[in-house]
A protein has these predicted regions:
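Minor-groove-contacting beta-hairpin "wing" of winged helix-turn-helix DNA-binding domains
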Residues: 196-200
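Long, highly charged amphipathic alpha-helices
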Residues: 53, 177-180, 209, 213
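A short, conserved structural fragment
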Residues: 186-195
């Protein structure tokens, strides 16, 4: 833990800090090292202790905890990532880049050589439509998928999940159902609400699980719109 405190002390004067739990990717060198028991991952209790140390550090040095894994000095929030969390459309340009236009998401192919070849062909022939399906893939987002993504991302931020926004953008019935779903989470002190759902300090430790509890499926959407 002392090493962690020293790491935080080193970055105390920068305006923005992102701290994410490490995701162990299969086939990576670290994965192999851990599989061979040359290193071990910290247990949950140790991770929670690190998080508490991080929060204390952030408060002491006037960082705003504006997203579960992100801290900033005033006016230094990440504009790039905030677009994801606030459901704003964005355009990705380049190999493997992702784009989002509210109703769909698309991602460009990841092979750089193929990407360049397709662009050359488009520039030569001037017919983008013939290459569209080869250059990127697209996923159409259903209303249930859209509201679930909003719940998942907004709950991670200090701005919270607004029931009025859900009622206006998706369906009043969605907002009514969501208000009913949170009662047990409120009793267990995971979430609080006055028309805006926000995670408590305790709830932040279980953000993904809580969001999943609040998700809607396609049948929910059909039922609310009958």
């Amino acid at each position: 833990m002392q090493q962690w405190k020293e790491n935080l002390h080193f970055v105390k004067n920068i305006p923005h800090i992102s701290c994410y739990c490490l995701t162990l990717e299969p086939h990576s060198q670290l994965y192999k090292t851990i599989q061979q028991k040359q290193l071990s991952l910290p247990d949950d209790d140790h991770i929670i202790e690190q998080i508490e140390v991080l929060k204390d550090f952030a408060h002491q040095h006037q960082f705003i905890h504006y997203e579960i894994s992100n801290f900033c000095k005033e006016n230094f929030h990440s504009r790039h990532n905030s677009a994801y969390w606030q459901r704003k459309p964005y355009l990705g340009i380049g190999c493997s880049a992702h784009s989002f236009d509210i109703n769909s998401r698309q991602w460009n192919i990841c092979n750089i050589n193929s990407y360049i070849e397709f662009l050359d062909e488009i520039n030569t022939h001037g017919d983008y439509q013939n290459f569209e399906n080869r250059l990127f893939e697209r996923e159409i987002l259903t209303p249930a998928m859209q509201v679930n993504e909003y719940i998942m991302t907004s709950l991670r931020t200090i701005y919270g999940c607004h029931l009025d926004y859900i009622a206006h953008e998706f369906s009043p019935a969605f907002a009514e159902q969501l208000a009913k779903k949170i009662s047990l989470l409120q009793q267990d002190n995971y979430i609080f609400s006055h028309g805006i759902l926000r995670l408590t300090e305790k709830g932040m430790l279980f953000a993904d699980a809580i969001a999943a509890e609040l998700f809607f499926d396609e049948n929910d959407y059909l039922t609310t719109n009958e």
